[in-house]
From Swiss-Prot:
Self-association and partners: Heterodimer composed of CtmA and CtmB.
InterPro entries the UniProt entry points to: FAD/NAD-bd_sf
Gene: ctmB
Name of the protein this chain belongs to: Limonene dehydrogenase subunit B
EC number of the protein: 1.17.99.8
Lineage, top ranks: Bacteria, Pseudomonadati, Pseudomonadota, Betaproteobacteria, Burkholderiales
Length: 549
């Protein structure tokens, strides 16, 4: 052991949750050290530059950034993190050269739908307002509060009309919910179901159906980070460092040091090596890693048998996502036009354009095929990040250039072969399919192309096993109060001094800040630190209505 460090709090992992916890606790007066195995912080907030084109390899659609407490609490906008809200949220492209388009503004969406079906327009308004209420009054506030057990939650739901509505939704599959909307325009249902399920939500399972209203609402209000997604993690890190937080990059945790049944520190070494080892003693250890790593690698099986057999079983039986993502990033000399722009000019700037499906049944069929390991149909969506932020392409050297981000839900291990062999041909298929909806696409306009496969996801970020993008499947035993298990979902573990804050903890994955935000408060309370931030008004209001504890 060549070196010993002392601090109040060690945070394992500098993804957005780890940085959030670290920044809050540093401002609360704690001496915080964040340990990150990679050469940069941010986790899934990855932006890499290729020939002047900025490709957001992972997290791109910020569903919750504008409502997440850390954005204001930590002053992220002032430090350079600015989100851009698109006017046109999404379009679904049809084979006949037309489209169905939805806007961030409700009335614009209603008018857009009215041109196709007046009945669907009014039905959409009803659903939108109902789901907005569910999101604003419960689902968003619940993200930044303590989880509630399922039995207690059901009882709480039954005490309010809003709760009853959420309970009704949660008992249906996403596809059944889509059917209940009763749209006579199948493409409208397909677009909404796709936007909900593109995050790996199985349209035929009820495990996470309570999230349908939230995803419906937030995907129509998703934002883009100006300059690239990594700007968000950079400002999070800056907020922490300005408060005294230290970040140790290129170092990986070898083990959590246990003494008398308590976590008292960590042992780290330069990434990819066995030493020299550094011991970091701390009063609290907060880990953003998944349960298999926290309870299966960092702590010995013998120790876990004594401290928590439940956590050991969680590590052994953790279920990873049943699907992953494939991305084909294109740096283009110019942006092509879509055929549907002639019928609906709004398609030109739609944040997300879905292609390859035209009915909810098409969406279900595609997801079923993916779950079985097949890549039979060319289905996905495309975003031109340069529509909102032209500087994500090298405008000085290539005026008018554009970045296209093609994304598809895929199996981790396709039946067609290894991703090393499949990626190129599959990317070709997606590009060719997308070109069917365009007027003037020319492959010669592709200056740079980069494909990001499920295997690459796992290689870049080992915590994302099997191409995971939520740190674990959304199944009943890994949701809500049970994420990662009933002993740890409130961030505190059965091991004294050890806390969890990552995407495998309540409320789950995506860039919500929920795990990191909630953990910061739990640790601050236990350590007697100054809780300098105030609880969001929405959380207080939800509690007063009996929707939260």
């Amino acid at each position: 052991m060549s070196e010993v460090k002392q601090c109040d709090v060690v945070v394992i992992g500098a993804g957005h949750n780890g940085l959030t916890t670290g920044a809050y606790l540093a401002r609360a007066g704690a001496k915080v050290l964040v340990v990150e195995r990679r050469h940069e912080t941010g986790g899934a907030l990855v932006t890499e530059e290729f020939s002047g084109f900025r490709f957001n390899l992972h997290a791109t659609y910020m569903m919750m950034l504008d409502v997440a407490p850390p954005y204001k609490d930590l002053g992220l906008e002032a430090d350079g993190c600015v989100y851009i809200r698109p006017d046109v949220a999404a379009s679904i492209l049809k084979k006949d050269g037309t489209a169905v388009t939805l806007h961030g503004d409700l009335e614009k969406s209603v008018e857009s739908i009215r041109r196709i079906s007046p009945r669907d327009a009014e039905r959409f308004r009803e659903i939108y307002l109902e789901y907005k209420q569910m999101s604003d009054e419960y689902l968003i506030p619940a993200t930044y509060g303590k989880p509630v057990g399922s039995a207690q939650l059901a009882g709480t739901y039954m005490e309010t009309e809003l709760g009853k509505k959420i309970l009704e939704v949660s008992e249906l599959t996403p596809y059944q919910i889509c059917q209940s909307w009763g749209f006579e325009t199948p493409e409208l249902g397909a677009l909404l179901l796709y936007l909900i399920c593109m995050w790996g939500i199985d349209p035929t399972e009820t495990n996470s159906s309570y999230l349908v209203p939230l995803y419906f609402n937030r995907m129509l209000n998703a934002t883009l980070v100006r300059g690239g997604s990594h700007r968000l993690s950079s400002t999070l890190q800056k907020a922490g460092i300005l408060a005294g937080m230290e970040v140790m990059e290129n170092h990986e945790v070898k083990r959590i040091i246990m003494e008398d049944g308590a976590a008292v520190g960590v042992e780290v070494a330069p990434t990819g090596t066995d030493g020299p080892l550094i011991r970091i003693d701390a009063k609290s250890i907060v880990t953003s890693t998944d349960p298999t790593t926290t309870f299966g690698t960092f702590i010995s099986e013998e120790e876990m048998q004594q401290r928590s057999k439940l956590c050991l079983n969680t590590a052994r039986n953790w279920e990873w996502e049943h699907s992953s993502l494939f991305l084909c990033h294109l740096g283009l000399r110019k942006k092509p036009r879509f055929k549907a722009e002639d019928q609906d000019p709004a398609v030109q700037t739609a944040f997300i354009r879905v292609f390859g499906v035209e009915s909810p049944e098409d969406v279900v069929k595609h997801f079923n095929e993916v779950m079985e390991g097949h890549l039979l149909h060319d289905i996905g969506h495309v975003t031109f990040t340069t529509d909102l932020d032209p500087n994500q392409a090298p405008q000085e050297t290539e005026p008018g250039s554009a970045v296209a981000r093609i994304e598809a839900v895929v199996p981790y291990a396709p039946a067609q072969g290894d991703w090393a062999d499949v990626a190129g041909p599959y990317g070709d298929r997606l590009i060719a399919k997308l070109a069917e909806y365009m007027v003037d696409f020319d492959p010669a306009d592709i200056i740079r192309r980069y494909q990001y496969t499920p295997v690459y996801i796992e290689m870049k970020i080992p915590q994302m096993k099997r191409g995971s993008f939520k740190h674990g499947a959304y199944v009943m035993t890994q949701m809500g109060y049970s994420r990662p298990n009933v002993q740890c979902s409130s961030n505190k573990t059965p091991i004294k001094g050890l806390y969890v804050c990552g995407a495998s903890t309540f409320p789950g994955g995506m860039i919500t800040f929920g795990g990191g935000y909630n953990a910061a408060k739990t640790v601050a309370q236990d350590m007697g630190l100054n809780i300098w931030w105030t609880e969001p008004d929405e959380v207080i209001a939800a509690r007063e209505k009996g929707l939260l504890l």
